[in-house]
UniProtKB/Swiss-Prot annotation:
Disruption-associated phenotype: No visible phenotype when grown in the absence of nicotinic acid.
InterPro entries (alphabetical): 3H_dom_sf (IPR035922), 3H_domain (IPR004173), HTH_11 (IPR013196), NadR (IPR026043), WH-like_DNA-bd_sf (IPR036388), WH_DNA-bd_sf (IPR036390)
Cross-referenced Gene3D superfamilies: 3H domain (3.30.1340.20), Winged helix-like DNA-binding domain superfamily/Winged helix DNA-binding domain (1.10.10.10)
Function in brief: In the presence of nicotinic acid represses transcription of the nadBCA and nifS-nadR operons. Also binds to DNA upstream of the niaP gene, probably regulating it as well. May bind nicotinic acid.
Subunit relationships: Homodimer.
Keyword annotations from UniProtKB, A to Z: DNA-binding, Repressor, Transcription, Transcription regulation
Organism: Bacillus subtilis (strain 168)
Protein name: Transcription repressor NadR
A GO MF label: small molecule binding
Amino acid sequence: MTEELKLMGANRRDQLLLWLKESKSPLTGGELAKKANVSRQVIVQDISLLKAKNVPIIATSQGYVYMDAAAQQHQQAERIIACLHGPERTEEELQLIVDEGVTVKDVKIEHPVYGDLTAAIQVGTRKEVSHFIKKINSTNAAYLSQLTDGVHLHTLTAPDEHRIDQACQALEEAGILIKD
């Protein structure tokens, strides 16, 4: 690979980072590929390289998001909760959480071979929940919790603890929250 091509790659990654920083909503790999006039696979590789340099980019079901320090601090309260339900109740679970003004940051399971597996979800509204569910259904992807008979963890974030308490109460009333 020539020095010029490496520079082009670095310039492209700089531009990707700029687009992500400027965007008010997630950008898909396809959207970024079209803007950069490259394949989606090139974008996936570029994002991986940026993440390897500790650039705070997360992949969500809606696309890539740049998480700057201000955005990360905007949600002050954070809590990990344990849940149990079948895949048919995932939409209900997520809606109960977001209806209280809480964002579901991720889902985590403890796999018997691989250990902890975590996937970013980043849903904070019913619209985002709907998009997430549609994406799962349209791709025939399995929920991580299906690997653990429905047991899973979520990291929740909100402007305050009270909202997370309200979401937990709603989940408990629905029989989804695992309490100790």
